[in-house]
Amino acid sequence: MKKTIRQTIVSAVLASTLLLGGQAMAANFNYQDNPFTLVYANAITKNEAGKVNIHPVKYRVNGITIAANVYTPANFDPNKKYPALTVAHPNGGVKEQVAGLYAQKLAEQDFITIAADAAYQGASGGEPRQTDKPFNRINDIHGMVDFLESFKGVDTNNIGALGICGGGGYTFAAAQSDKRIKAVATVSLFNTGLVRRNGLGDSQISTIQERLQQAAEARTKEAQGNVEYSANADLTKITQADIDKMPTGLYRYGFEYYGKTHYHSNSTPRYTISSLLDLMTFDATDHADLINQPLLMIAGSNADTKYMTDQAMQKATGTADKKEVIIEGASHIETYRKPEYVSQISEALTQFFKAKL
């Protein structure tokens, strides 16, 4: 049974690993061609007077060094006050991908924005690498707020939060307690704890106890210096036929995004198996009623993750100022990159944050 469950876990995670692809895959956006290693359309290539500028920064959260990019609006004057936004990246993603895209888009609308790599991930510090625990991800968002409060030019009474995919779930959770966040928005929310526990679309409920046992065993090994990860496949050997067999659009489109079109060397879906001890007992919506801030939730009509946005919106009973925007025709990953959908989402986010901050 243990072997069967382990194979089930590896197969499921391999699918999610495939959506980040391997280093051998050619990228439409080559992170090495951009001085800030940004991999999205119309990304900043240099700081120029009178335009949106990017500022790589480092700071500490709970003793761990966090790497982040701050975007300042065109003609930024640090002696003036600007509304500001935190932007939390997807699971396995990094600040240079879709989080950077929306951070730049919103900076173009006169917001100061910050996109940070999660602790233990990307260019941020922390060991073991790829530890992926809700407490850390939520504190990453609190830490971004901390940083913004000390950044000259930020109107500390007008800080909002945006999260994408897994970062959306963690932003939704962070806003439940952090009332410094005055407005909350999510794009393609992914409730990581729910999916790690039940599987995407409740496809792994029958193996919950066995996977918890595996996580406990991994914790023991980790304490002895042997870190176990969710997948260790040689992605250079994955074929197109393997990709075509992927069961969901999330994985197929994700492979194209992370593995081909927007590949970044710091991005990986791998996480420590011991992290499941925390992930599988977490749900981003458990205290959704504590959100009393204005709330905007955006999802694609064709996203196989849309049900998570629907559930979170339904549970957010503590705010009367809430709106769900459905992007017709969009899948989960298409909200990261397809120009017409990115434009619609950027417009909705701009209108929301300008009205609420």
Regions of interest found by a model, annotated:
Residues A330-V342:
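Catalytic histidine-centered segment of alpha/beta-hydrolase-like enzymes
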Residues N79-P90:
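Short beta-strand element of the alpha/beta-hydrolase
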Residues F172-E256:
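Alpha/beta-hydrolase-fold enzymes
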